[in-house]
Amino acid sequence: MATTRSAGGAATSVDTGPAAGNSGIRKLSTASVGGIAGGVAPSWQSCYYCTREHFKSISDFVNHLRNRHCTREGGSFVCRYGFNGVCASLPLDGVSDRDYDAHVAKYHVNQHTREMPPEWGVYSAAQNLPAVLNDPSRGKQSNLFTKKWGEHFVERSHVPPSPRLPDITHADFTVYLGSIGKRYRWHERRQQQLERDKPLENGAQGAPGPGTGGQTPTHLSSVPEIFLKSQLQLHHPATFKQVFPNYMQTSASSPESHQQTGRQLQEQLSHYLDMVEVKIAQQVSQKSAAFFHAMTTQHAILAEMEQAADQVRQLRAALAELHSHSVVDSFKVLRFAQRRQHYNLTLDKLRLMATVHKTQPMLQLLLGTQDYVAALDLIGTTQEILSAELLGIHCFKHLPMQLSEMEKLIDKMLTTEFERYAAADLNRPLTDALRETDSVCAEEDKLVAIVMGLLRKQNFSFVQAYQQEAIATIRAIIKQLLIEVLARSDSDQEISLTGHGEQALELTLPEWIALLQRSSQALVSILERIKTVVGIMQQTADAAVGAQDAVNLIDSEAFLSPGHHEQLKNQLQQLLQAVCHYCHERCANIVSPQSLERSSASEQELFQLSEIVDHFGETTRSICGVASVPLQLALKVQASRYAQRFHSERKQKLSLLLDQERWRQVDIPHEFQRIIERMAAGDYAKPEMGNLISNGAGNPVLLVEGKQPYTLVSASLMLIRMLYEYGCSAHRLPLLASYHARNVVDLLRCFNSRSCQLIIGAGAMRVAGLKTITSTNLALVSRALQLVLWLLPKLKEHFQAMSGYETIERDYQGHIKEIENKIHGIVSERLAAQLDAWEARPPIPSQTFRHISRHLVKLHEAIAGVLPEAQIHEIYGVVHRNFKDKLREQLLKLNVNNNGGPQHGVVTSELTFYMETLRTLKALPAEQLDNGILEEIWLY
């Protein structure tokens, strides 16, 4: 065992025995490591050269040094714990394993913690050289390179004191010194007292102890704690052993040794006693003044205590007298009053029990008068009394269960009564309902009582039950009406109604309409009855919730919460909507295509259906506030079928008329003139339908707006009549307007395409047997198309259609343009053929120009009575331009020049004859009929 002493005086022992020869870690004893350097942390708790390395024990630190800071060269160990891997105490030489452990324990484990000097860096300088040289606030300095580097390299500037820091004087500490001075003086006195006590304690340390040759301290800390306890029980073996240690432990010891040991023990105990007496003497000497003062005042204290005892005896006697005369009698009065109160409470309990005992007879009486709300309130109040005030009463232990069963019975009774009432009210004959004036609902008071009871129980299922009963009633009414219709019908079919029953019957269309009308009337009566019942339910709910504007139907307080009231209100509204929707569905089955698939409704019958459906829809909307769709959809299906049939008939008829059309002008009957006038005015209310007479009395032209004449063919007249029929049908039945609008577009498209095929495509020569397509035929078609173009804005406004009419208008305009091109193309080709054979020589006018004049006259005769003057001028203008172009080509071919020669004179004479013909026909505007052509013809 090698023993060393550290700089702080702490003894450190290192075990270097043979048992630690091969162990990697030696046991290091640090008895007083915690006191090194006045509380500084030991050096083994962290490594100087490894970051984030901290150790909880010396063995961990030693293992770290051996693993990280030690190298082994052969059989020796070299310590590397130091800067740059060199140990300051063992720099180069290697040592054995045991010596390495001793070196670590001596120089690295037990050395004091010293802070390593910081390494010098660029920030350790007094001045930052780059910052000084690059200071932007200072210009170039002449003595920059002659100055010596140091703390005076940069001139110091005076920093004034901060205005935010106040001046501190001695007066600022006056309050603090006054508050702390008293405690400080008390502290000084205590310090002086302790300094005076220390010499006394140090002077008593020279007394010899028993069995020892040295000095033993006299402080109480040297006295064992066993002697300082309040109770010293020597009969306990443990206590006896502590008081007499090592006494009679060996049986071989002699009597002299026992005596010697006893004397030593006696001397030690005597020494302990002396120490305690000395300490007591010190305490008595310190407190002697207080002790003598207490002894002197003891007699005075005894006298005061005797006087106080006499006063206590007198007070007790007075209290006893007061208790016997005042308190006892008062308590008797209070006891009697409390007993009277208890008697009254008991009497009240008995009266309450008597009242509760009469609950069941009272319930039977209330149920007999159908006052369900009062009965339920009585049950609820009785249950509250039983649970709060009569809890534990033995005679009423079964009453709560009986009341609960009775409450369930009332709930079931209310449900049954409501279902019975709903069935009786809904199944009343409809004739009785029609005679009711004040209210459709019968026995309103009974209904209010039942509904109020159901609301008191918060049983809202009665709404669903009433809805199911209403639907069943509606179904029964429809079946009954079907049976009655079949009974009146002449058909021999077997009556078998299953399910809805309407779809499997074969009835005529008037019978279906009559059935729908009777059904709608009956359903309206039922719906009015249902609406009245729902209104009474709503009024009852308003009264139950305590609404301000509600009718007072109950005598008790409001018991329905606002949330439940809103829920019931929504359920009642949904009931009306569901019943109305079901009525529409059943009526829609009557109007469905499956029911009417063998019948084709006429316009009058469809009008009747529309009136019935609209009236029924408005009535149901006024009842439930929501429009129902099924019946309207069924009516639209029938309207679509009628519109499709209506359109198919007229489209087929128009196609036949176009195929048979001879494309000749016909007289316009007066009825068609009136039709055009009504269509121009938008009046489709009174249709005029007469027989179409081609050669009867009438005007030769159709006057539009009183001044525009239209020459038409019979097919165009029939088209006008059809368009008027479409407008009248849409005016009478607005439901058909959307269908007719599309069908009118289709009809006009059919007329346009078919007339184009027959006239421009020459289909009329094959279908109608025409020999040729003349200009008159083309002009008549063009005029018919122009009449349709005039009618298009009126039709669009009447049908309120937004799509399709623009396309038709473009198609018609293009067709008219094609007809014009066809007309002037025919004439231009004939004029060009004549000019090809013409030569500029006499006679004048030549035969060629005579033929040209004849063609112009024929064209004018063909189109003058059909087309308007502006269109005639446009056609002749195109023919005139083509004539001039062809004549220029011929003049160039004949090499005729504007030189005043004979050929030039011939050309002038021919053109004069040509222009005279145009003037006679008035085929061009007046400004184009001058002799300007005589100069224009030579302008190439």
Swiss-Prot record:
Chaperone in keyword set: no
Q: Which UniProt keywords apply?
A: Coiled coil, Developmental protein, Differentiation, Golgi apparatus, Phosphoprotein, Protein transport, Spermatogenesis, Transport
Q: Any idea which residues bear Phosphothreonine here?
A: 30
**Chief place of localization:** Golgi
S-S bonds: none
Output one GO BP term.
endocytic recycling
Q: What is this protein called?
A: Vacuolar protein sorting-associated protein 54
Species this chain originates from? Drosophila melanogaster
Encoding gene, per UniProt annotation: scat
